[in-house]
């Protein structure tokens, strides 16, 4: 009997081509991770001061091993980090940071007295059930309290904080502060450099004067009222000013331009009115400008597009009018740009594309909005080139998806046709 060489050969060739055309799945290599070197305690010839060692024990800080080299293994459990100096004959504690404090922790005056005067930094993070001690050491240069001391309704008092006259860094956030005014706290802090009192129910007016050493001020999310004092512009070293989420009113002072070291200016969610002062153009390295959620009016000044270091610009939800004076290249260079919620503001369609989704209407030939834009800025109206690219890529994937399905069906049908032809030829040959 003569074998069916031709049909069989055709079938084998076709099946071989089909298999080779199918996508191959190579085994995924197992991920490799470089081993993390174990923490090596720093060697020191001096033991820790016995009185301070006893003080750490009373604060529930482990002392079986050297507490100065102890580091917590997880972030979810109660932990403490102690830093010591290298003095002799005994080392001394310089810094303690408590995180997720246990409910049985108590900060005694006796322990703090033993740790003073070497203790210069004290931090409490997420210690809501903790009660503040009657007094903190005068030696402190840095004090931090975040989401802590919430057992009392009043949290921390202004007098309690005002005693820390040697502070250079004060951070109080999500902790109520009861005081008749910010000046009570800052009056004698002549060395203060960084000041944060945010989300603290702080009320009253902004002080008319600040200490000249300040480089960072964050008084956001409080109940501060009144106007921005012109004297704040005497802070020539100030790099960041955040007064957002208060009830501050009045104009932005023209002298704001005297803050020549400023990089971040956040005045959002207040009751500020008037135009954007031209003096802001005198701040050479401003990178973050947020004036959203106010009652600012007038036209948006052209000088903003000349600020070469600007990366974040939010002017949303104000009362600006006229034609937006920015071109596409300026907007593309910004990481964040929000302009919606200005019903009388519009853009020139010959300069900017509608695809940019700015949240404002297109201008007519008279420079007026063609249609009413959204009343409030929507988070989806941010101009983001990255999102636009992602969308186009998804469209490409959706476009190419059906082609792969059609190709698979065609290969399957052709295989079936060859099989039928082979069976017919085989039947004829056998017959």
Swiss-Prot record:
It holds the Pfam family LRR_8. LRR repeats lie at residues 161-185, 189-211, 212-235, 236-259, 261-283, 284-307, 309-332. Residues 426-431 are cytoplasmic. Glycans are attached at residues 100, 166, 201, 213, 242, 264, 297, 327, 348. It comes from the Eukaryota. It is found in: Cell membrane. Changing residue 108 to F: In snc2-7; reversion of the snc2-1D mutation leading to the suppression of constitutive defense responses and subsequent reduced resistance to H.arabidopsidis NOCO2. Residues 1-21 form the signal peptide. Disruption phenotype: In snc2-5 and snc2-8 mutants, impaired basal resistance to P.syringae pv. tomato DC3000 leading to increased susceptibility. Changing residue 137 to S: In snc2-6; reversion of the snc2-1D mutation leading to the suppression of constitutive defense responses and subsequent reduced resistance to H.arabidopsidis NOCO2. Changing residue 412 to R: In snc2-1D; constitutive activation of defense responses leading to enhanced resistance against H.arabidopsidis NOCO2. The chain crosses the membrane at residues 405-425. The keyword Transcription regulation does not apply. Its main location: membrane. Residues 22-404 are extracellular. Keywords: Cell membrane, Glycoprotein, Leucine-rich repeat, Membrane, Plant defense, Receptor, Repeat, Signal, Transmembrane, Transmembrane helix. GO terms for cellular component: cytosol; plasma membrane. Involved in plant defense. Required for basal resistance against P.syringae pv. tomato DC3000. This is Receptor-like protein 51.
């Amino acid at each position: 009997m003569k074998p069916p060489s031709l049909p069989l050969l055709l079938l084998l060739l076709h099946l071989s081509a089909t298999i080779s055309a199918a996508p191959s799945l190579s085994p995924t290599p197992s991920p490799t991770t470089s081993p993390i070197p174990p923490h090596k305690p720093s060697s020191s010839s001096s033991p820790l001061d016995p009185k301070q060692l006893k003080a750490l024990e009373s604060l529930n800080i482990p002392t079986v091993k050297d507490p100065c080299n102890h580091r917590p293994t997880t972030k979810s459990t109660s932990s403490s980090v102690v830093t010591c100096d290298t003095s002799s004959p005994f080392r001394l504690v310089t810094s303690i940071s408590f995180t997720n404090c246990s409910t049985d922790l108590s900060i005694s005056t006796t322990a703090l007295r033993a740790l003073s005067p070497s203790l210069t930094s004290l931090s409490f993070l997420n210690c809501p059930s903790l009660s503040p001690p009657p007094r903190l050491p005068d030696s402190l240069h840095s004090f931090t309290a975040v989401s802590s001391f919430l057992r009392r309704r009043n949290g921390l008092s202004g007098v309690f904080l005002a005693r820390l006259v040697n502070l250079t860094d004060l951070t109080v956030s999500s902790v109520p502060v009861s005081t008749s005014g910010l000046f009570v706290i800052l009056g004698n802090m002549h060395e203060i450099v960084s000041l944060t009192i945010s989300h603290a129910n702080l009320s009253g007016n902004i002080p008319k004067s600040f200490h000249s050493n300040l480089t960072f001020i964050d008084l956001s999310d409080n109940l501060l009222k009144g106007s921005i004092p012109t004297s704040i512009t005497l802070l020539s070293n100030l790099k960041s000013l955040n007064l957002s989420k208060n009830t501050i009113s009045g104009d932005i002072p023209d002298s704001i331009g005297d803050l020549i070291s400023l990089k971040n200016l956040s005045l959002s969610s207040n009751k500020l009115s008037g135009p954007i002062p031209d003096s802001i153009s005198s701040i050479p390295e401003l990178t973050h400008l947020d004036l959203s959620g106010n009652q600012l009016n007038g036209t948006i000044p052209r000088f903003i597009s000349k600020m070469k270091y600007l990366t974040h610009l939010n002017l949303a939800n104000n009362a600006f009018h006229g034609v937006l004076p920015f071109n596409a290249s300026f907007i593309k260079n910004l990481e964040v740009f929000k302009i919606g919620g200005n019903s009388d503001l519009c853009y020139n369609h010959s300069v900017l594309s509608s695809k940019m989704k700015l949240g404002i209407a297109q201008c007519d030939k008279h420079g007026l909005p063609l249609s009413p834009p959204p009343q409030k800025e929507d988070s989806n109206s941010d101009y983001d080139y990255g999102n636009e690219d992602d969308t186009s890529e998804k469209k490409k994937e959706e476009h190419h998806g059906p082609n792969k399905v059609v190709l698979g069906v065609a290969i399957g049908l052709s295989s079936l046709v060859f099989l039928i032809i082979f069976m017919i030829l085989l039947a004829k040959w056998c017959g």
